[in-house]
Regions:
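Conserved short alpha-helical segments that host acidic/polar catalytic motifs at enzyme active sites
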Residues: 1-351
Length: 351
């Protein structure tokens, strides 16, 4: 995954300083053996429970704000029946950054924690973590902690990203050099920003997807989500109000798509279905090659969610499925290949 990311360096923009990129990153499974050691470093004995990890950006030079952020995280995790192992300073090498990337670089830390309920597993655990994260984000926003950002908070996956060039990712994040840092999948992205200015927060992948393209219907989609929020209801969450607003403040079109995709996943829609709801396939009732079941499915989905239209190639995961797909007009490049040893690659280029 890291080598593949380095190979698409040409897909991204580079600042005049020659080292600052629009953003690059990688989304992988939490490497369990790697983080067991990190838990034990905190002075705790690993008890075979699911290790949950949060990858967090804090304001680098505002120490009071850092403490406020950490206090909110600790408080809400504890309130929601999680136990905190401790905080971990993520080892980084700022020397590989360009001047602009270094000037805006956040403090990068991880929080290691577990659920106090051993029966809370998989989707149920992820749902609880998601709701807790939304509470944390909303509280931080209410007190104007603007440089606080959670890249990932999960028992399943973790995201390493920033405003460096793709080839510098493992030189910047030293964790990625560790032999125990393994995963069954990797979603990687090299950004060329179009609608929004580059920032550490808007580097991709996001929590559920990586997106190449633009959402031309974004303003309408955002307004429709505000309408849908009024009708949102589910027994799966403690309080549905904790999840609002679904689209976070300051989100780019790609980040907003990720917000909605993630909510659908966490609410029980598998990644392939969430993709069809948001970025539907091209279809017509006149298409005789399409089965009646598929026509009925697409017709139903069309009545439940407005399409997020525009040039788009996405890769995403709900921690069970890993998907890659095009928009219905095929306006962004996406190719796939299966190797002789059964590795599936999908990306903007082949070879």
């Amino acid at each position: 995954g890291i080598e593949a990311l380095k190979a698409v360096w040409h897909r991204g923009a580079v600042d005049a300083d020659g080292k600052t990129g629009d953003g690059a990153g990688i989304h992988v499974e939490i490497p369990k053996d790697f983080f067991i050691e990190k838990v034990e470093v905190t002075g705790h004995t690993y008890d075979n429970s699911e290790i949950c990890v949060g990858m967090i950006f804090l304001p680098r030079n505002d120490y009071a704000a850092q403490e406020n952020c950490k206090t909110i995280v600790e408080s809400e995790l504890t309130k929601n029946d999680f136990s905190i192992y401790g905080w971990r300073q993520v080892p980084v090498n700022p020397k590989v950054l360009g001047e602009k990337a270094f000037q805006t670089m956040p403090e990068i830390i991880q929080v290691l924690f577990k659920s106090n309920n051993p029966e809370l597993l998989n989707k149920d655990l992820e749902r609880k973590i998601y709701e807790t994260r939304r509470i944390i984000e909303n509280k931080a926003f209410q007190i104007s902690l603007n440089n606080f950002y959670i890249c990932s908070l999960s028992s399943k996956s973790i995201i390493y990203k920033g405003m460096f060039l793709a080839e510098a990712i493992s030189e910047f994040f030293l964790d990625l050099k560790d032999e125990r840092f393994v995963s069954r999948y990797a979603i990687f992205h090299q950004r060329f920003s179009t609608n929004t200015a580059p920032s550490w927060n808007l580097a991709q992948p996001f929590r559920a997807i990586a997106h190449n393209g633009e959402i031309n219907t974004y303003r309408g989609n955002k307004n429709w989500m505000k309408v849908h929020e009024q009708e949102m209801n589910s027994p799966l969450f403690d309080n549905i109000e904790n999840l609002k607003p679904v689209i976070q403040q300051g989100a780019s079109d790609s980040a907003a798509l990720d917000n909605v995709f993630e909510l659908l996943n966490i609410s029980g829609q598998p990644a392939p279905l969430a993709k069809l709801m948001l970025i539907p396939d091209a279809w017509s009732k006149k298409n005789k090659t399409l089965s009646k079941d598929h026509q009925q499915l697409f017709n139903f989905l069309n009545s439940t969610m407005e399409p997020w239209d525009g040039p788009a190639a996405i890769a995403g995961t709900d921690n069970e499925w890993v998907i890659a797909a095009n928009d219905r007009n095929g306006l962004r490049p996406l190719r796939y290949a299966i190797t002789k040893d059964n590795l599936l690659f999908a990306g903007s280029e082949t070879g």
